[in-house]
Structure formats: C-alpha cells, structure tokens
Amino acid sequence: MAQLTKNFGKIVKTLTIPHLLNLQIDSYELFLQKDIPPTSREDAGLEGVFRSVFPIEDFNRTASLEYVSYEIGEPKYDVPECIAKGLTFEAPLRIKVRLVVYDVDEETENRTIRDIKEQIIYFGTVPLMTEKGTFIINGTERVIVNQLQRSPGIIFEHDSGKSHTSRKVLYSCRIIPMRGSWLDFDYDHKDILYVRIDRRRKMPATILFKAMGMSRADILRYFYEVEHFTFEPHHVFRQVLPDFYRKEKAYSEIRDSEGKVIVAVDKPITKRAWRLMLEAGIEKVEVDPATLLGLFLAEDLADPATGEVMAEAGDELNADLIEKLKDAGIVELSLLHTRGVDTSSSIRDTLALDKTIDTITAQVEIYRRLRPSSPPTPEIAANFFENLFRNPDYYDLSPVGRYKINARLKVDQPLDFRTLANDDILKAVKHLTFLKDSHGPADDIDHLGNRRVRPVGELVENQYRIGLVRMERAIKERMSLQEVATLMPHDLINPKPVAAVLKEFFGTSQLSQFMDQTNPLSEVTHKRRLSALGPGGLTRERAGFEVRDVHTSHYGRICPIETPEGPNIGLIVSLTTHSKVNDFGFIETPYKVVKDGQLTGETIYLDATREIDEVIAGANAPLDENKAFINSMVGARIRGDQVVIPREQVTLMDISPSQIVSVSAALIPFLEHDDANRALMGSNMQRQAVPLLRCEQPLVGTGMEGAVAKDSGSCILAEGEGFVHYADAERIIVCYDDPAVGTDTGSAKTYELLKHHKSNQNTCFGQVPRVLVGQRVVKGDVLADGPGIRDGELALGKNLLVAFMPWCGYNYEDSILISENAVKDDTFTSVHIEEFEVVARDTKLGPEEITRDIPNVGEEMLKDLDDCGIIRIGARVAPDDILVGKITPKGETQLTPEEKLLRAIFGDKARDVKNTSLKVPPGIEGTVIDVRVFNRRSGEKDDRTRQIEDFELARLDTKEGQHAAAIAANVRRRLWPVVSGKTVFQTIKGVKKGEVLLEANHPMTQEVLEALPVKKLSGLFTSKETNEAVAEVLDEYDRHIQFIKGLYDQKREKTTEGDDLPPGVIKMVKVYVAVKRKLNVGDKMAGRHGNKGVVSCILPIEDMPFFSHGRPVDIVLNPLGVPSRMNIGQILETHLGWAGMELGRQLAEMVDSGKAMEGVRDRAKAVFDTEETTALIDGMSDDDLRDALRALKNGIVAKTPVFDGATEDELWSWLKLAGLPEDGKVTLYDGRTGEAFHRPVTVGCMYILKLHHLVDEKIHARSTGPYSLVTQQPLGGKAQFGGQRLGEMEVWALEAYGASYLLQEFLTVKSDDVGGRVKMYEKIVKGDNFLEAGLPESFNVLVKELMSLGLDVDLIQDEKKIAKAPPRR
C-alpha cells in the first residue's frame, strides 16, 4: 500500500539521481575487469599496468618475459566470514606469461627465437570490493577516499606582482605529466625566460630549444614576425607584406602608379591606406634609416666576398654595423619585429644570455644541470635528453594530460600520443610570451577544469605499477645472473614486492580510511568524499585560503556546504547529488538543453571546462506547458556570474535545484533559509546520528531520504519481479520470475539479514524484514530495512513536539530540556556493541590456558562461565566481571625453605599461574549477545567450540532445506502452465495410508501439484510432449539442487575446520556485549539545521509545559538560539511539522469516528492537493483509503526539496487548514503551577537526532588506578583510567582561598607521594584520618634532572649541618 505524502516541490524531475556509490564501484570494476574475457579487456586498470611493464628484457636482449593475460579466482571466504575471522576479502590473481629465449647474431645483431615457454603463475591476491563499495582489510571495513588532485596537462600562471620588489607581474607556465619530469617556464623581472626541469636549477629556455634541434635563426623566426628592408643610395625601404600591417607615419609621400597621393608625408598609414597601397601594387615604402637602430637580425649575415659571418641572428643593429654591412655590399636585411604593442624582445634577450652553440652543447648542458656529478659524452647526453620527454617508459602525460594540452594549445594530437612533441613545447612558450606581452589572464588553478578526481581504481592501479616496477628490476637482475635457457617463468617472477606495496597502501595510506559507519548516511558520504590531501596532494599546513574556498566551477559538482570544520576545511569536500566523474576524471553535472528559449528534452553532462561559454538558466525559471520560458528576461549564469538576459540567448538549464548540494545537505528541509555555517554543521551532524532502537522517518523531509537508504546498501532490495517464498527475522527467500536472476540457484535467492552486527563505530546494525510470505515484489522494492531506516527511507531521529521558550535557566546556552517520557518510552534508546578479545598464547614458561579454574577467584565471579571458562550468551555483565577465564604461567620465584618443604610434600603447583582473565572494563554494563571461539586447525576443540559448531551446522541444514523448498516452489510455478489440465496415467497416492490424491486418467489440479514431491512428476502424464517438457524442467531442478548442496557442503566444511591463527596463538575468543544507552543528562542532541545542544535536565512529564487540551510538549529549546545563528529553517520545519502532525491526526480521527467516506475523501484531497496524490486517492477503494489514512495518525509526511520547497503562503495555508494559529504560537501552561505562561509560545514538531557523543562514554570516575612510572603521578584520560589534572591555575585558586591543608593533600598523597599513599591507606583502615605527607616523587625527578646537568644536589635534613655563608667584607 502506497504511503500518502505531501510533496511541496514544483519542479518536475526529469532525471533520476545516479546511484550514489557508482564512482567507487564502477572505478574498481574497470580496474579489475573481472568478468570480461582476457581478449576483450580494455588497456586500463590492471590490464593496462601489466601491458605497460611487460615485456621485460634482459640487458643483453637474449630473453624476453612477455605478459599474455590474467585471471582472478573466487575468494576463499565471503564478507561476513572475513569480518568475523579478521581476514582480508581478496581473491587469488594468476597471470599467464611467456618466456621467449633468443639467439643473437654477433655480427648483424639480429635475433632469432630459440625457445618459448608459457606458464600460468600465482601472482598473490588482489583485494575485492564489497557490493557496498568498501574493502575488508584484516577484518575491518575500510574506504578508499577519492583524491582531488591537480590535473596533468598545461597551466599558465602569474604571481600577481608578489615575487619581486618592483611589483612587476611575472608569468610562468608549467607542463605536468602523470609520470615523468615537470617542465616549468618562468619569466624573471628582466624579462628573461628560464626553464626548469623537475624543479632543479633554472637555465635560459633557449638551451631547451637548441637541444630540440633548433638553430638561433629557427628560434627567432618561430617567435617573431620578420620584416625585410632594402638599402638604396641615401634611402631605406621596407617591404610591404599583405598580412603584416604596422601603424606608423609615412617618411615620404606614398603614391600609386598614376601618381595619386595615398599617404602624405608625416601622416599615419591607416588600415584603409594600407589596403589602397596593396591594391595599387606598392611593394615597398621608404622608412627613416634611424628606425633600423635597435632592431635585431633575424638570420646570420655573411660577407658575400669572403663568406665570413659578420653578424649572428639576434645581434642588435647599430650605426657601425649598418655601415659595415653597406661597405660589404649587403643591400637586403631581415629584421625581427620587436616594437609592437604586444611584442617584446624577451626571447632574443634570453638567446643572448645562452652560451651554448648547437644541439650537442645544449644537450650536454641540460645533462650537467640535472646530473651535476658525472661528466657526459654527447651520446649519453643525447640519450638522456631523449628519455626526458619523448620516451613513453619514462614520460607519460596520460590521456587526460594530452586532452588538456590539445585543448589549451589548440593542437590536434591523438589521445594515445602521451609524450611531449617539440610543437607542444614551442606553442606553450609562444602562448606564454603572448600572455606576458599582452598582460592576458592566467589560468585559475582552483577551477575544476584544472583539478581532477583520482578514483579508487586509479589509486590502486598506481600502487600496482610501483610494485611491478620494483619487481621488474629484480627480474632483470635474475635474468643476467642465471642461465635463462634453463629457467621457467616462475623462477623469475616473485610477486612479493607487489603484495608489500598493496598491503602498505590498503593498511596505512592516508586515503585508505577506517569507514565511518555510525549510520547509513555516514557510510554514503564517506564513499562520496573527495580529499585534496594524501600522496601527491596538498598538506593541510601549506594549503592556502584560495584552494579551500568555494569556486564558481563547483556549481553542481562539489557541495559548497559539506566540509569539515577544523584544519581540513575546504580540503575535504563531497560530490553533489547529480554529479558524475567522466573517463578523464573531471566532475560533470547534468543540464537540460535549451534552443530558442525552449527545452529540447535532451539532457547532457558537462565538465567545468566545456561549460565555460554556456549560458545557463536556473532550475526554477518558470516554464509554460510547451516547456518554453514564460519570462522574456531570464536569470542565468555566464562564467559563474549572475546575469539577466533575453531567453533566446540561454543555451542550458539546471536539472534540479538540489544538484548544487551534496547528499547530506540535500536532506535538510528549508536549507535555503539557513545560514551557510549552520547548514554545514547540520549536514555534518546528521552523519553522527546514532541509529535508535525504534526508527521514525521525519514528518518534514526533502525527498532524498529514499535514495540514500536504498543506495547505501543497508537495505535489502528485490532484484527483479517475483514473490516472497519465506521471511523471518533471520532470512528472506524470494522466488524470481526471471531465470537470469539467481541462475545457479533456480531463480530463488536467499538474503541473510544482519542481526546485532557491530559497526566500526560500535553502533548496532540490524535489518528488519518489510515483506510478508506470498507478497509480490518488483525490482527495487525494499525487502528489509537497515539500521536508521524505516519503510525504505532514512530515519535517524524522532519527531518531537517542541516549544521555544526559556524554562528556569535549564536551556541556557543551547542546553536542552526534555521530557521523562523520552527515557521511559525508550524514544532515544540506542544499542551499542562492544567487542572484547582474549588470546591464549604459547609463552616461554608454557602455554596460557582458557579455563574456569582460576586461582583466588570466588564462585560468585564464575557463576556465568561455562566449563571451558567462557561466559554464556545472555549473561548480564558489569564492570570487572570475568568474560573469559585465562591463566598464564608465572616465572619461577625464590621460595623460602618452608615453601619448598610444603611444595615437596603436597606437590602443589597451583600457585605457579597468575590470573590474566578478560574482564569487563569500567563504564560498560550490558548483555553478552555472542561468543566466537577460534582454534588452531590442528588443535583440539573444547566443548564450547563443538556447541557453537553444532548450532551453526543445524542452521545450515535449515537454510538448505528452505532454499531447496523455494526452488521446488519455483519449479511448480513453471510447471503449472505445462501440466494444467493434463491427464495422469496412474493413480497418485498421498503420504497417509490409503490416501488417494488423484485417480488415474484424471486431469492434474493445482492442489495435487502443490502436495506432490517435485521428483514424482517425472513420467506421470499420458502425453509424451508433457512428460518431455516436465523432464526438461526437472533436469534443471536437479542441477540447481546439486549446486546448492555443494554450496552448503562447502559452508559446513568451513564451519568445522579450524582457523588460521597468528604464530604462537593457541586459541582466541571474542565476546560481544550489547550495551543499552538510554538518554542521559549530558548527551548531545541536534536538529538538522546545525541547532545542537546538550541535555541539561530530564523533567518529569507532569512538570513539562502543556497545551490547553492537556498534552505536554516533549522538548523545550532556547528561543535565543535562533536569531543569532540565522538558521530559520528550524522554525519553518517546526510550523510545517505541526501542521502535518495535526492534519494526520484529524484524518485518522475522521476515519475512526465512522464519518462518511465521501467527506473523508474530499478532506484528504484538500489536504494533499497535488495532481499525483489526488489521482492516487481517487484510485483507492474505501478500505484501502481507510488503512492509508489510519497510518497517518502520527502525522503526514511532507516533502520540501531544497531550494524548491514549501513557500510561506503554503505553510500558512496548511496551518489554517489544520485549524492552527497562522503564526504557529499558542498559550502554554506551566506543568508545576498550572498557570498560563505570560506570552504565546512557538510550538510545533521538529526532527531531533541523538548524536554519537554520549556522556556514558566520556565521563568516568577514578579512586585509585595506574600511575606514571617516572613521576608516579596518576595517568590522564579515560582510556588509561586516569585522574583529573590539578594544574597551576587550580593551585592559585586554592592558594587564594588559603586552603593549605587541602593543597598539601592534593600535591602529595593524592598525587605522587608514594610512601604517603601507603601510610594514608593504613590510616584509613585503622580509622586514623590524619595527614602525614612525605616528599613528592616529582621532586626526586627534579633532583635527578639537575644531576644530569652536572649539579650535585644534597638534601640536608639537619639544620645544624647547614653551612653558614661567610660574612661580606
């Protein structure tokens, strides 16, 4: 039955939210390509790494180890087994390699194949991802966080005038590869261009150009326009070039062929005049000879007679040189154009600094700069330079880098060309000089077009590459040390370096994190998180404000709200609801395409770069029925700026208003009315909400709750159409119609439900079935709710009746006053599971033993332990109770003669062991819910282990029987159309004696088919075709039964076999204790708007403020917490929740009071008032409508999507409809006196969460406990069972009060006076409470410290021994 909800959203959804875990799951699937045949795999992920590292050749090129393919096996243990046993969820990886041995001809160096050996080699294990997008590493669930990193490619920057005292803006360019040397071009304040390779010493950039094979003239001609001048006696002419216009004054009259003056003397040559000159065929114009001075030669000039070089390209022209050239008879000059507004002589000036003369010297110079230690030969230098940027083994731009360079420099190289071409470098420098000369804008490094996401698949791929490169070195060494012809591939390959790198990455990397598993929302947001930290990223100390700030390109891609509050603010962010990551790693967001002011119905995903030139309208721009803009002027965004423009210019439109925020922020109703800081706190605190004993979905939601619940993986969803064959609290079995679902298991799938599962944060995760036996389900239906989920929707807190008013100071400073009902009814009770582990080891003195026979322990302490010394399930335990009894052998101590005698007479060895039992730590009180015992494979099993095994085997038998019955039910369903009405040729007898189910020659009925065992249907019918059809189905049935039998046999085998325990461990026991945490004073609570507080008082229900009709409120909040925090969303939620609560109650009452259904139906339509819900109500029968309205007795669920929610008018109209005051205020009465409060109070319904900051886990009390070894002072902190620190400020306070005896007690016997502590204990025992303080241990520490500095300090007890100082003279 559909739940009736009121949706206040106006914008029609045209695109469903992509699966929230797609990024993690798809990325790792692409990395593994597990189910793709080896021949069809893409050159990416694991396949790409193997292809890039192999083939591996030896140094003499006599052998080559080639990669063929890989295969990934099935994991040995499933996910629950890995978590229980503390193992890694992984699968074996095997690679097929080929060792080719060659014969090399010494003269020609040609190779011929001598031998080929192919082999499949075990290559370690590879961690697998669970269906929820997590990894199980050593039994703990971890998440690999996606990294947000600077994209490979090219970037142009400037320093904004901050680098040099002259405040001159210095431009730079950087080419960043995925792997290889960085290339930086930087201008200095003198306009000299330098290059740095790998951020080493800088050198003139022209050295790099020369190393690339360019001459001085080539360099100058590439970067400058060339002008041609001609000397004639007493005149200098410049050639007129069609595509080279210069604005200057005419030196002499310019006439056309007819003598008509085009430009007069000293008049400027305009563009029109230039065009007339070209039309008139004028090829040269006279210029002032003085203009040549200071220009630079474009090429070398040689004496025509002798061939001697008179001037080199780049030399400056002066009067002497001009005369020299004229004397030599040179009449034509090619000069560089360096005097334009946007041209400068920077490249020529750099060339003048460059002392290298040709390619070889340039390459040698680069080698020297990068490898200063060894002098190179030209061949080594040339090879080194070639490897820098042109060898794919050493330099890899990656497809992303090539794509970015192609787009920025407008070059057209294929994406698989992943090294640097000369053209790339030259165009980059040319663009850099253009930016410098024209003072153009630099690239924005914080723009999302210049930052990309490295998802989990790519991060693991990089680790594999590191490991394989290490392995490659070892293989090459082995090939050179041994005779390759006698070796097999497995002799060369050792996968340990790869395994070590992977283990380090998954276990200790900054990006491999312990999953935040407080509730399903915290899981989802952790998997959708992007981190700028980690290897190859930023560090929080060095990250500036700009990189942390919200950027216009984040719109629709990265949430501007959700980020941590501490030092990581802005460095750790979240993906928005609709965003995707494309193949290049850039974040994309969806838009609707607009043409001529009308939507085309097409949806496209764009990254931040491709969006730059688009004009994008907001999602809430009003449209008519033809999906055209109603208003002629529309609000839109261009390059991040808000503008109002004609509708015809709009090219795109937002998909949804919620596309700009993340999942957590999209769960906050009326987010648009909250201050950004409080919204940030609200989205962060929802992740800390503890799943409660009884969940309740919010009365005021946003519509995102269902998507989060279903995509989190905490719910169990139906995989297709079918019916529920079996359902209980442990498992659900669904029989599917589609044979493709559960192919091996006869289209019947068993779903095991989680029960009392301990999460990473110790919260209790359990699943509750939501379907009944026989119920039809379709794909995506919720079969079972997870923790913090109700009816397939996220439900983290409770709907409470709230009043905003002060109450005797108990809600001062955000404190919360709450009704005793919340504790009595277990409203905010949550269950937390603590895991305790004890290990029995083999020690040098003998083995430890887990036993009930513990020395010096009374029977009372052992009452809940079984014969093996392990606590029984269901036992209530308190601090210091024994969970598992364990004794450890003691070292031999010196015995007195009397003890030796007794030992010899009675043979008493019992005192040789000490009690090392596992006890309940302080602050934990609960019930034992599970015990797991792990034994060595070869070890003997105790009674408890056998008992657990027997119970598990019985469960497996039951499960197998239920699964087989489900397969049989599916078979009967498939057979019924085949056998319906078909006659049987023999009488069918029942189980009971003499019972006949069906006489011979009678048609088959449904009842008989259900009563008959499936196997007995074989050959039962008179029709041959029917028997054949039945036999075909039964063959399939046999195959499925055999498959599940094999499956359960494997599970039985695993249950009875021992465990792989670490070396030296005999037995391990894990005990799980469920702790019930009721709401307590000091617990932290919060709403969804950043309105957090601590419970200050739990008030008896009779003292709570109450309404005129007698109902008390549940919670009282401080009204002063709203105005200054500016989170008005909580007030709007309160009003809307109150209206929904009241309207739901009224509709349920109308049904229960027996009112005419016609009136009830009309009232329901008036309340819900949307086309969709009205149609749903009209389509319901009276009985269905009654049931649906009765379900609303606690309130109507209202959905108010972010930025598209309920307006004030709608809110007021709902309050009016419910018969409530429109201002949301009523008069309340004091529960203690019964008198009305002086002013009306804002009341309503608010969704309140209990956060994972529980007072029971924070506060503890110490009388005596552990002391520090050095200072002998009590330790600090709850974990060490430490004491409260008494610092110097507290000492000053006690001094101020003159409490000298108290102070002496604090500083001596209560702290570090060891002797005094013992004496104090004796005095208390005797009843003599007299303080006798000694010397604090810290004083002795001070004395020893002074001694270590060479100062001998003696403590003199007797005054007479004090030496008197001699009198001063």
Curated annotation (Swiss-Prot):
Catalytic activity as recorded in UniProt: RNA(n) + a ribonucleoside 5'-triphosphate = RNA(n+1) + diphosphate
Keyword Transferase tagged: yes
CDD domains membership: RNA_pol_B_RPB2
MF terms (GO), sorted A to Z: DNA binding; DNA-directed RNA polymerase activity; ribonucleoside binding
Entry's EC annotation: 2.7.7.6
One Gene Ontology term from the biological process aspect of the record: DNA-templated transcription
UniProt keyword Transferase present: yes
Signal peptide: none
Pfam families for this protein: RNA_pol_Rpb2_1, RNA_pol_Rpb2_2, RNA_pol_Rpb2_3, RNA_pol_Rpb2_45, RNA_pol_Rpb2_6, RNA_pol_Rpb2_7
Top EC class of this enzyme: transferase
GO cellular component, one term: DNA-directed RNA polymerase complex
Keywords, ordered alphabetically: DNA-directed RNA polymerase, Nucleotidyltransferase, Transcription, Transferase
Family of this protein: Belongs to the RNA polymerase beta chain family.
Subunit structure: The RNAP catalytic core consists of 2 alpha, 1 beta, 1 beta' and 1 omega subunit. When a sigma factor is associated with the core the holoenzyme is formed, which can initiate transcription.
Function of the molecule: DNA-dependent RNA polymerase catalyzes the transcription of DNA into RNA using the four ribonucleoside triphosphates as substrates.
Name used for this protein in its record: DNA-directed RNA polymerase subunit beta
